[in-house]
């Protein structure tokens, strides 16, 4: 069975290490760790296909801006006939603490425009991995916060490594095992922003 891992972000060098691009950062790290081939541009996304253990996986980074992420993802899903239960979207989340991971299927989009775009075209019944980027300090604009770079990139990279270490658990029926493994690892990591 084919699985689709999607990272949300904005294309362009100026966005590379911004909080809003943590989804892209996760997909890039997965690609390098599991030796996927280089990305190719198809369906208005950067795509790479490979395997994680015995699971066939497509990695995708929509090459539209965040607000239009749904169109390329919908195109990939329809072409490869990927069931919604096999789609996992990695994205930034301002409503949870820095470097905290939450996983859920369906639900609202909490104002996240990338998720809104996907929901409009595919519905909400896919998996989301929410990567906490923290809420901006008093007086800081939310758009400035999400489009600025991380203060503690080391903590971000450690959290991404924890995700990769247990990523094959995401392909199992009980995704709570992944959540608990990653949560336990993060608990012992310095994640001060």
From Swiss-Prot:
CDD domains: PTH
Coiled coil: none
PROSITE patterns associated with the record: PEPT_TRNA_HYDROL_1 (PS01195), PEPT_TRNA_HYDROL_2 (PS01196)
Binding positions (tRNA): 15, 65, 67, 113
A molecular function (GO) term: tRNA binding
Chemical reaction(s) catalysed: an N-acyl-L-alpha-aminoacyl-tRNA + H2O = an N-acyl-L-amino acid + a tRNA + H(+)
Gene3D superfamilies: Peptidyl-tRNA hydrolase (3.40.50.1470)
Keywords: Cytoplasm, Hydrolase, RNA-binding, tRNA-binding
GO biological process, one term: protein quality control for misfolded or incompletely synthesized proteins
Localization (cell): Cytoplasm
InterPro entries per the UniProt record, alphabetical: Pept_tRNA_hydro, Pept_tRNA_hydro_CS, Pept_tRNA_hydro_sf
Active-site residues from the entry: 20 (proton acceptor)
Source organism, top-level taxon: Bacteria
Site for Discriminates between blocked and unblocked aminoacyl-tRNA, residues: 10
Residues the UniProt record annotates as site (Stabilizes the basic form of H active site to accept a proton): 92
Subunit comment: Monomer.
Family as reported in the entry's similarity comment: Belongs to the PTH family.
Protein name: Peptidyl-tRNA hydrolase
Organism name: Ehrlichia ruminantium (strain Gardel)
Name of the gene encoding the protein in the UniProt record: pth
């Amino acid at each position: 069975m084919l699985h689709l891992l999607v990272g949300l972000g904005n294309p362009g060098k100026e966005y590379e290490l911004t909080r809003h691009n943590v989804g892209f950062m996760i997909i890039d790290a997965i690609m390098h760790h599991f030796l996927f081939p280089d990305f190719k541009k198809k369906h208005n996304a950067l795509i790479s296909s490979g395997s994680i253990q015995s699971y066939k996986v497509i990695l995708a980074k929509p090459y539209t801006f965040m607000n239009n992420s749904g169109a390329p993802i919908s195109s990939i899903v329809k072409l490869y006939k990927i069931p919604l239960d096999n789609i996992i979207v990695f994205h930034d989340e301002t409503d949870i603490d820095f470097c905290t991971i939450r996983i859920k299927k369906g639900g609202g989009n909490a104002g996240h425009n990338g998720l809104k775009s996907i929901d409009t075209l595919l519905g909400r019944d896919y998996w989301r991995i929410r990567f906490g980027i923290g809420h901006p300090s008093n007086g800081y604009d939310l758009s400035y916060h999400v489009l600025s770079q991380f203060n503690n990139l080391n903590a971000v990279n450690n959290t991404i490594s924890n995700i990769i270490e247990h990523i094959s658990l995401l392909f199992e029926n009980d995704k709570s095992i992944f959540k608990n493994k990653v949560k336990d690892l993060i608990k012992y990591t310095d994640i001060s922003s």
